[in-house]
Amino acid sequence: MKLGLCTWAYNRTFASGKMDLEKLLHVCAEELKIGGMDIIDVHLKSQDLDYLLKIKKLATDLQITISAVSPGNSFGKDKREDEKAEVEKIRQWTDTAYILGAPNLRIFAGWAPKERHKELWPKVVNSIKECAKYAAKKGVILAIESHNGGGYLPTSVETFKLLKDVNSPWVKLNLDTGNYQDADMYAALKASMPYATHMHCKIHELSEDGRELQFDFNRIFTILKEANYRGFFNIEYEGKEDELAFVPKSFEMVRRFIKKYDMF
């Protein structure tokens, strides 16, 4: 298994102006000493070719793999032109992932009022199918992330249905260890492992002695071990504490479990 960072872990630090992508690449290499990063769209200053090549060159020089690029999107729009715009957005971000050398593009199914999910579902499926055809030409996997907060994919049930309905080898999962709302989140994670091309390691609350207080990491690592997961496991700290202090603490905690479960 490969340990990396999701740039969202430093989102508040980015917003304050104290962090940018170039600086964070150096932090990953020199302080966190990790080999991978997935980049949230808002943390890229632009999609201009010269800038993207600059980021790719710096990442390569620092021996950092850009494991995924993660735009925000939401399919299932009422207006045809709005849905086409979402598809075009994902096509453009597929190009960005290709330029950066990222094998995965994290996408969402989207959000809509729960009472409209069934009605809008075919639009979501068709749009992802269209995006997958384009991604296949670029050799980029669309890694769908189940997300809470009223999305189409609150649980593994809807997530598996989407994978079945889209039915593309270029569509897999960006499996987040903290997003499923199933009654048994750990059973859902275990069932999802065969479809995971990339993962987010969610950290919400760390104790002063470095324990995650909301998630059972022994159960999570047992699932990872049994699945023989070898992809990137990128830490996404979403706690309320200072990111500059608690992201490194998150890596210390996860490294203890990597050692305990012999997941090097």
Where are the language model's segments positioned?
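A structural motif
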Residues: K33-I34, A97, A102, A196, ...
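Short acidic/histidine-rich active-site segments
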Residues: F232-G239
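Charged helix-capping and loop-helix junction motifs
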Residues: M19-K23, Y51-K54, E83-R91, L120-I128, ...
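Conserved residues at the C-terminal ends of beta-strands
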Residues: I40, F108, K202, E236
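A short helix->loop->beta-strand "cap" motif at the edges of active sites that frequently abuts
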Residues: I64, A102-P103, V140, A227-G231
